[in-house]
Amino acid sequence: PMSDEVVERVLRAVEQVPPGRVVAYGDIAALVGTSPRRVGSIMGSWGGEVSWWRVTNAAGRIPLHLLPLARKQWQREGTHTDGDRCLISRCRADLAQLSADYRAAVADLS
């Protein structure tokens, strides 16, 4: 079963990704201490309240049914894309900064 705290940590981590930047499920998983698959599952169930288009798979892709809306958000934020995916190598968030921001964002959970 998925603990409420893991869900909260994943969502708070996603909230720290700046506009125009993306991270992979694995990047969030490493921060939170869970698996990329669990991050994907949490995003599928609870990610609607956060900037879900900033979290992709390692190739910069997002689930196909979300692509039209994600494309609009990527364009609005100036995210580097190539057709149906983000160019994650060009627009990945600074992971050291993300880690620092995440630690501050979850300080009240420890």
Summary of predicted features, one role per range:
Residues 1-110:
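Nucleic acid-binding interface residues in structured DNA/RNA-binding domains
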